[in-house]
């Protein structure tokens, strides 16, 4: 399938997919290979939440939250999320931060500010954007849209391995149940349900290594006439 989208001077590749589909790792390696900027949209919400706690801004103070989001100094580099130049990748995974992210994201102006920040990551020479609605909502004109899939069993096994490597105990059956429940919620929600864009390339990573998945995306990108 050849893209009919016009060439954009600052190309974007979107990598969407469900939890533990490998999109974060694939996006980071792809960005490093191409020398592109990287956006981890899920981490962006958590970074805003963490900053709001650190600066003492209440979850109900919409005006202060919007200003905070506009002023945040955020970078994603080599798989790390940085706030004000400090790696906070572990801090943003805390349950309390996740709860705060959910609490602030219910406000329309806050969501709009976060969408604007995501789009501001589009800078030369290009961007790889990882998330759930990158190709459908945030960057509908992306030169290449990829939707990663994998069986729930494969994703649960990956998440279990990740947690064990980080020193956390985890039950794979519980992880599998949680993933299936989250998939159902994400696919059926009214606002920006998790689904591939109509013109997205589907890539099942169940039996693929990370390198194989990255190579496939690079092949698609080259086929569009883009240097890779």
From Swiss-Prot:
Major place of residence: cytoplasm
Species of provenance: Burkholderia ambifaria (strain MC40-6)
A Pfam family matched in the record: Cytidylate_kin
Cellular component annotations (GO), alphabetically ordered: cytosol
UniProt keyword Heme, yes or no: no
Compartments it resides in: Cytoplasm
Keyword Kinase found: yes
Catalytic activity: CMP + ATP = CDP + ADP; dCMP + ATP = dCDP + ADP
Name of the gene encoding the protein in the UniProt record: cmk
SUPFAM superfamilies for the chain: P-loop containing nucleoside triphosphate hydrolases (SSF52540)
Any one Gene Ontology BP term: pyrimidine nucleotide metabolic process
Superkingdom in the source lineage: Bacteria
Family: Belongs to the cytidylate kinase family. Type 1 subfamily.
Binding, ATP: 17-25
Gene Ontology MF term list: ATP binding; CMP kinase activity; dCMP kinase activity
InterPro entries per the UniProt record, alphabetical: Cytidylate_kin, Cytidylate_kinase_dom, P-loop_NTPase
EC id: 2.7.4.25
Alphabetical UniProt keywords: ATP-binding, Cytoplasm, Kinase, Nucleotide-binding, Transferase
Protein name (Swiss-Prot/TrEMBL): Cytidylate kinase
PANTHER family, per database record: CYTIDYLATE KINASE, CYTIDYLATE KINASE/PANTOATE-BETA-ALANINE LIGASE
């Amino acid at each position: 399938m050849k893209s009919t989208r016009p060439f954009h001077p600052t190309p974007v590749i979107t990598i969407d997919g469900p939890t533990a589909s490998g999109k974060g790792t694939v996006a980071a390696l792809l960005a490093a290979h191409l020398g592109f900027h990287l956006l981890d949209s899920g981490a962006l919400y958590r970074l805003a939440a963490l900053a709001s706690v650190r600066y003492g801004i209440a979850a109900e103070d919409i005006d202060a939250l919007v200003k905070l989001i506009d002023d945040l100094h955020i970078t994603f580099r080599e798989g790390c999320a940085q706030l004000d130049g400090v790696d906070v990748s572990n801090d943003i995974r805390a349950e309390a931060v996740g709860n705060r992210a959910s609490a602030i994201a219910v406000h329309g102006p806050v969501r709009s500010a976060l969408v604007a920040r995501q789009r501001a990551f589009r800078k030369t020479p290009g961007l790889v954007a990882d998330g759930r609605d990158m190709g459908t909502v945030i960057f509908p004109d992306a030169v290449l849209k990829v939707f990663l899939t994998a069986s729930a069993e494969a994703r649960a096994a990956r998440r279990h391995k990740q947690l064990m490597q980080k020193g956390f105990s985890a039950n794979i059956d519980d992880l599998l149940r949680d993933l299936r429940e989250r998939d159902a919620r994400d696919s059926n929600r009214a606002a920006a349900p998790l689904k591939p864009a109509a013109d997205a390339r589907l890539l099942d990573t169940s039996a693929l290594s990370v390198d194989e998945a990255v190579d496939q995306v690079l092949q698609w990108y080259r086929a569009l006439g883009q240097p890779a």
